[in-house]
């Protein structure tokens, strides 16, 4: 849900000629490369050893998934997580005209959230949830964490609530 929303926002911005990048900060559950159909891509490095993000449809993308073997888990904690997140912000050579970076967070309010707060204290957030009570509960906690950390919340998106049945035009809950 969150990754699909992040990707859709990035695609919409790119369609409006806004230069955008996506950081897949969901280190343990990366899905951005799958959504963008870039799972086999491998970043290159420039002469200064900066990481060159993968580009798809005018959107720059970086993910841990690009640095691991297919199907292999990422078994990191603490310092290693912080190091990778820092690399994504400081060592990726985004295009000079990149206007926005969308960060796809992991679920919850753990290390990655705190690391990103220290890197970009002025970050603005969109909370993504589903109608399921447990997802809503986590979203509320994420909202409280964002406020505690001083992040501005732009809004809340409730994903996967319902769709309009194309056959009968009725609202169908998911």
Regions found by a protein language model. Give the residues of each.
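Phosphate-binding loop that captures ATP/GTP phosphates
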Residues: 13-71, 89
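Switch II (G3) loop of P-loop NTPases
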Residues: 43-45, 64-115
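Conserved, well-folded catalytic cores of nucleic-acid-processing
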Residues: 16, 34-39, 65, 87-95, ...
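Short acidic, glycine/serine/threonine-rich loops at helix termini
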Residues: 5, 33-37, 73-74, 114, ...
